[in-house]
Regions:
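Short solvent-exposed loop/turn micro-motifs enriched in small/polar/acidic residues
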Residues: 1-3, 225-228
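Short beta-strand or tight-loop elements
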Residues: 13-15, 227-230
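M16/MPP (pitrilysin/insulinase) zinc-metallopeptidase core fold and M16-derived inactive scaffolds
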Residues: 29-93, 270-272, 276
Length: 276
């Protein structure tokens, strides 16, 4: 996809603001992406980034949990968040005239999270139930096992949600330390697409996000071991078997990715594909 109206600004404190103007829509999608995910965790705190994401909507020093939702939903908008291996994103979708409201709420949940002990313990229970649901889904669990075998003894090989044991043992202090280390301006990208003027977006970001220069964020670098032939079998008393196999390939920007996309269509792209 070609970004015809793509603009980017880096503020003095390192925070990056990116936008693309799309004149065919009247809404905007706005995301605050913190470049910290499960890949930045140690084995001991696996699942912390995801748990922290859950805590974002439990209340801030300015808003209750209900107010966070109401301030967006009363405008016909939607607010949510997700965690990946390399980043955590807090996002909203709403009409373009409510850009300031969106920036205000997202800035609040990212910067002013209360992290109350009782909320943390409550969300641990929620996350543990999510993990149980994944463990009850063969199609989900084989993907976790596949990644584990593909990246053994590496953060990429660990589940984003963590495990029952690691999530249960995470302390508030560990969450605070993780936040202090990674939730810094130079480690945050604010992106918007839709009917949004870049200059206006930058203005609102400067208004609601801290302009202080925080600690320079340092990420740990983990080296991949060569791929070896490995397998894992998980037996469950169900009638249907689920099989997944694969290997690591070239980087995502390699020109051969186009050939791989074509191969994907040939093998599994429809009723006439080879593997159907």
């Amino acid at each position: 996809m070609v970004l015809n109206n793509y603009k980017q600004t880096r503020l003095d404190n390192g925070l990056r603001v990116v936008s693309e103007y799309v004149d065919s829509v009247y809404s905007i999608s706005l995301g605050v992406c913190v470049l910290a995910g499960s890949n930045d965790e140690t084995e001991e705190i696996n699942g912390l980034a995801h748990l922290l994401e859950h805590m974002a909507f439990k209340g801030t020093s300015n808003r209750s949990a209900l107010q966070i939702a109401t301030d967006i939903e009363s405008l016909g908008g939607y607010v949510n968040a997700f965690t990946s291996k390399t980043y955590t994103c807090y996002y909203t979708r709403l009409m373009s005239e409510y850009l300031e409201d969106g920036v205000d709420v997202l800035a609040d949940v990212v910067q002013n999270n209360l992290l109350r002990e009782e909320d943390i313990e409550r969300e641990k229970t929620v996350v543990k139930e999510e993990i149980k649901d994944s463990e009850d889904s063969p199609s989900s669990i084989i993907h976790d096992y596949f990644i584990e075998q593909l990246f053994p003894n590496h953060p990429y090989g660990r589940p984003i949600q963590g495990t029952q044991e690691t999530v249960g043992s995470i302390s508030r202090q560990q969450i605070v330390e993780f936040t202090d280390k990674y939730y810094n301006p130079d480690n945050i990208v604010i992106a918007a697409a839709g009917r949004v003027k870049h200059e206006e977006l930058v203005e609102q970001v400067q208004k609601y996000f801290s302009q202080e220069i925080g600690t320079q964020t340092e990420h740990s670098h983990h080296h991949f071991k060569p791929v070896e032939k490995r397998k894992k079998v998980y037996k469950k008393p169900i009638k249907q078997s689920h099989v997944l196999m694969g290997t690591r390939i070239f980087p995502r920007k390699d020109d051969r990715r186009f050939e791989l996309s074509l191969l994907n269509v040939l093998l599994s792209g429809g009723l006439s594909s080879r593997l159907f």
